[in-house]
């Protein structure tokens, strides 16, 4: 009888331990290969976008904003004052970039990224953010980070994703890959 009680307690404790491990599974071991990871968007593969946009700043994945945001950002007058810089391009280039961005936007039919869908669901249909950092989802995910860690020389801005998200270039924004300069690993 005593052995049966020990076996029963061990089984219960084992089941509890397994449930914690399953609950903590965020797809990390599959993070770059699993397109359905809740932390991943499709990485930038368009060479023109890399040349024209990602040569000046981090190449934000198209799946981080809805079509209407990319359409607004790519308007000629917006490009003339692109966050304080003149990012004007010729019309053919502008239309090619716009096509790439809207076809891969968070709300595009072909985009199957869970993160893109989540980002899009948190943006009001009456809102057209032109910066990812303006979105409600982004603000909620970054609200606990002290300002001093954001404005420091090695980060400079909340818009500098790659400063802290070590796998952002690959489109992966999981917590396990966050390392804030002069602070270390960040974990909510």
Where are these regions (language model features)?
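Bacterial N-terminal signal peptides that target proteins for export
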Residues: 1-8
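Bacterial N-terminal signal peptides
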Residues: 9-17
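Sequence context surrounding c-type heme c attachment/ligation sites in exported
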Residues: 22-54, 59-95, 99, 105-106, ...
